[in-house]
Amino acid sequence: MGIILGNGNVLNQAGELTPMEILVEKGRITAMGETLDRCGHDWIDCHGGMISAGLIDAHVHLREPGFEHKETIETGAKAAVQGGFTTVACMPNTRPSIDSVETVTYILDKASEAGMARVIPYGAITVRQLGKELTDFAGLKEAGIFALTDDGVGVQSTAMMKKAMQKAAELGIAIVAHCEDEDLLIPGAALHDGVVAARHGLPGIPSESESIHVGRDILLAEQTGVHYHVCHISAKESVRLVRDGKRAGVNVTCEVSPHHLLLCDEDIPDNLDTNWKMNPPLRSREDRAALIAGLKDGTIDMIATDHAPHTQEEKANGINRAPFGIVGLETAFPLLYTNLVQTGELTLKKLVELLTVKPAEAFKLPYGRLEVGAPADLTVMDLETEKTIDPSTFASKGINTPFAGWVCKGWPTLTLVDGKIVYQNV
């Protein structure tokens, strides 16, 4: 017996929504058609929603082990499926860092126990993410990591980054970088080095702290041949560097977060609400425009949430002391659909690709496809019903979002992972 998703629509090659039913059996899509034989199968009414491949997020912070007061693998995985994400890659800035086979195994086991989204851990580039000694890349790869990164901090040593890229290239592992030159940072800086920081008399985080590392690493990637991926790109100069790198034939990809696409520093309220504090910071209107242009022309390969939960107590410490980061798994698709697709900035087809097939292709994942024979990772979206973002309804432990109160369409109503229903609100 299988499951038929009926009364739904899928995007065709022209980007048009067309009626389609999908049969799921033994974790795979086994049939697709406008009308399927229901005999012997359970039938789920999708109420006219859009059926897509499950969303993929290449950048989340699940906080476990070590920071379970912020989030756990279970609560993060629940948040993922509630937001339509079926595969998430979790960053290594935990305690201990994900720098050993034992920690990788721990995370994979915890994710399996949770039985929600598929969680794939990153491995740290350097031991304890201190930038001094490379981890056991081969051992981490065999244990099942997604890629290698020291996200949370940038690899400051050019020599260390080159050595990491050389070794990763030999093993066929991607190097994923949080690009931030600490020599250009002023202690306590929390906002972009722009008009808002100046208005409040605060030190700012300059765009060049990001773009200098992007440029450095693209040159190293060209020399070593590694797949190099830039995290949460935020500055127009970084977009230009990635575009130039692609044109030169460098194997470089990058991601952008929803908040950098939808907000700029001038949107930050005068009370400096710390739910608007993230790293990279919200940058200028010009930077935001460059990010959207980068999505349109293919410079930016995917959208990733950079889901970063913190407690309310931590976020109450004021703009200078509160930790960087906001949550994003449960609001990403509705926000992007409402504010980019419905406004005409992106097509629906393009948005879905940026959240499914594009990250799958970049990181060579067998997911993100809506076709017979593909894994039955599926999401159904209600593109018509309006709902208000209410952090009290989040499955995540974190409620740190600047988007509370925003009214959106495009809410997930059903999520399947490997053919198993893990979220249902139909």
Swiss-Prot record:
Keywords attached to this entry: Hydrolase, Metal-binding, Pyrimidine biosynthesis, Zinc
Chain residues that bind Zn(2+) 1: H59, H61, D151, D306
InterPro entries: Amidohydro-rel (IPR006680), DHOase (IPR004722), DHOase/Allantoinase_Hydrolase (IPR050138), Dihydroorotase_CS (IPR002195), Metal-dep_hydrolase_composite (IPR011059), Metal_Hydrolase (IPR032466)
Residues binding Zn(2+) 2: D151, H178, H232
Listed CDD domains: DHOase_IIa
Active-site residues annotated for this sequence: D306
Cofactor(s) the protein requires to work: Zn(2+)
Entry GO terms, CC: cytoplasm
Record's catalysed reaction(s): (S)-dihydroorotate + H2O = N-carbamoyl-L-aspartate + H(+)
Cofactor note: Binds 2 Zn(2+) ions per subunit.
Record: residues binding substrate: H61, L62, R63, N93, N279, H310, F324, G325
EC number: 3.5.2.3
Gene3D superfamilies linked to this entry: Metal-dependent hydrolases, Urease, subunit C, domain 1
Family: Belongs to the metallo-dependent hydrolases superfamily. DHOase family. Class I DHOase subfamily.
Protein role: Catalyzes the reversible cyclization of carbamoyl aspartate to dihydroorotate.
Protein name: Dihydroorotase
Organismal lineage: Bacteria, Bacillati, Bacillota, Bacilli, Bacillales
Gene this chain is encoded by: pyrC
